[in-house]
């Protein structure tokens, strides 16, 4: 339903951010580990976060960023924050 398509929309946005960084043929999945698989450093991660904050008009505190392990965590978090 609507949640699923919102989830998909957020995922596509995150996927686009990652592919801008890693190359357009980079395969992004929900269980990719942000730090291990993506080797995202804190600067890249902050760029993603700031982009998401602006795109969805939300605020993501540092402790929540630290708690995000995978791409899926990031997508779920944004979904939760925006579906109030």
Can you say where each PLM-predicted feature lies in the sequence?
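Thiotemplate assembly-line natural product biosynthesis machinery
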Residues: 4-27, 79-84
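Phosphopantetheine carrier-protein modules
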Residues: 19-39, 56-67
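Short active-site alpha-helical segment characteristic of glycosyltransferases
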Residues: 48
């Amino acid at each position: 339903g609507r949640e699923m398509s919102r989830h998909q929309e957020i995922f596509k946005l995150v996927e686009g951010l990652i592919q801008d960084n890693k190359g357009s043929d980079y395969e992004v999945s929900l269980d990719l580990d942000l730090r291990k698989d993506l080797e995202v450093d804190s600067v890249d991660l902050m760029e993603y976060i700031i982009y998401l904050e602006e795109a969805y008009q939300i605020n993501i505190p540092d402790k929540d960023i630290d708690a995000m392990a995978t791409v899926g965590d990031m997508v779920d978090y944004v979904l939760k924050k925006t579906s109030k």
